[in-house]
Amino acid sequence: MSYEERANAHPNLNDESDVEEEALVNDYREQVNFDDGMSELDRTTSLGAASQTQDLQAQLAAAATPLEYQATLETKFASYDNYCSLFHYILNSDGPVELEVPSYYWAWDVIDEFIYQFESFCRYRNRVARSGSNEEEAQLLRENPNTWGCYSVLNVLYSLIQRSQINEQLAAMKRGEDPLAFAGEYGSRPLYKMLGYFSIIGLLRVHCLLGDFSLALKTLDDIEMNKKAMFARVMAAHFTTYYYVGFSYMMMRRYGDAIRMFSHILVYVSRTKNFQKGGNSYDAIAKKNDQMYALIAICVALHPTRLDDTIHSALREKYGEQLNRLQHGGPEALPLFEELFRSACPKFISPTPPDFDNPSVNIDPVDHHTAIFMDEVKNTLYNPTIRSYLKLYTTMDLKKLAGFLEVEPEKLRSWLLVNKQRSRQVRWVEGGLLEGEPVNANDLDYALEKDLIHVSETKAGRRLVDWYLRNLARVY
């Protein structure tokens, strides 16, 4: 079955509301227009004359400033010490720190840069240990195993969340109650509230980098994935959240949910592209945008479904021939799956320091997770070919199909069982991101009775009325 035929047979029941998309676009336009007349200096001045406040302000500004790409190891150590001092002061002072935050952008920048430096340091340390070429740096890293340690970073993020009572505040908002009643002494301060909130997004990112995808999604239990969420006000945070949620779904084989997440943010980005140009995060967003198109190509190949017209056109433009190869399956598609996955996956990290004395035992975390993903792809490699034969019959002998495919009958039986199991996916409906209902992801179903295959096919017609309404709303 061609991509277009499958697309017509699988209407997307989870299309985002165009009204909500328009509201997000308008909100982002207002943010950009407002920020155009406000320099970074304007945002961070007039915060008080007290020297202590000014010192803290300077530390926060430094914490939000990206580290130089070619920074030395000593500079990375010093940056870690500065973050420790800053967060220790914020979390362990006698009472809440009195400081008015300039905007929610600032809190995101601090958490984002903190995690980025942690991630880049872990990858750098792993490269030094695996290469074994720079003994001086290896010795320095060996003597400081806790610098940028996984436990320290997670401890900071969880402490900021706990101190701000942000999860309790978000849960109260979902129940329609006053969040200030649950904020406490610290959570009522914007400084703690903003840092706590974006620490939740930071935890999503860190757990995903560590390969714990279910825990990554669990951290967002109290955050609603809609335009009212605070992260949607910051473009980089908005993009980051949907990227890591979508990727976590993909690694959990919930391809339908992954496609829904990727599609939402890609449509939003396509409609705000003109407002992003010239922004500090434009290049990073453009790169992540390309990565998500690669991931959505993988998901659509493994789980054919109907896409938004904008996404469909862009996907065909970027990966036309490659997408056809992915969908046809077979051994020749394996290198392409791996190439796209490596180019689009997060830069995974290890939770523990490497073994500097035995470089050969250190494994690249990206290689590790790529191997896990490719094992899953290999399990479904012949599904398109098998489906193309089964669609021609209502009953078919197992040995006959094995002859067509030139494989042993028992090997074919295992393929059919794997395909049957993979066709049952959990799809999110409401509640937490980990929740969902089991659904049959394919329009083709079958049952094995000894060596006889019983085939049934269901086709859902396109919802033309909905299609016309969506496109009329865009035109008018």
UniProtKB/Swiss-Prot annotation:
Pfam families referenced in this protein's UniProt entry, alphabetically: Paf67
Regions crossing the membrane:
none
User: For this chain's UniProt record, which GO biological process terms are given?
Assistant: formation of cytoplasmic translation initiation complex
Which GO molecular function entries does the Swiss-Prot or TrEMBL record give? translation initiation factor activity
**Primary subcellular site in the record, as a coarse category:** cytoplasm
Its domain of life reads Eukaryota
Stored InterPro entries: eIF3l (IPR019382), PCI_dom (IPR000717)
Q: Name one GO cellular component term.
A: eukaryotic 43S preinitiation complex
Where does this protein reside within or beyond the cell? Answer: Cytoplasm
Q: Which residues form the PCI domain?
A: 257-452
Q: Give the function comment from the record.
A: Component of the eukaryotic translation initiation factor 3 (eIF-3) complex, which is involved in protein synthesis of a specialized repertoire of mRNAs and, together with other initiation factors, stimulates binding of mRNA and methionyl-tRNAi to the 40S ribosome. The eIF-3 complex specifically targets and initiates translation of a subset of mRNAs involved in cell proliferation.
- Oligomeric and partner information: Component of the eukaryotic translation initiation factor 3 (eIF-3) complex.
Its name, as the record gives it, is Eukaryotic translation initiation factor 3 subunit L
Species per Swiss-Prot/TrEMBL record? Aspergillus terreus (strain NIH 2624 / FGSC A1156)
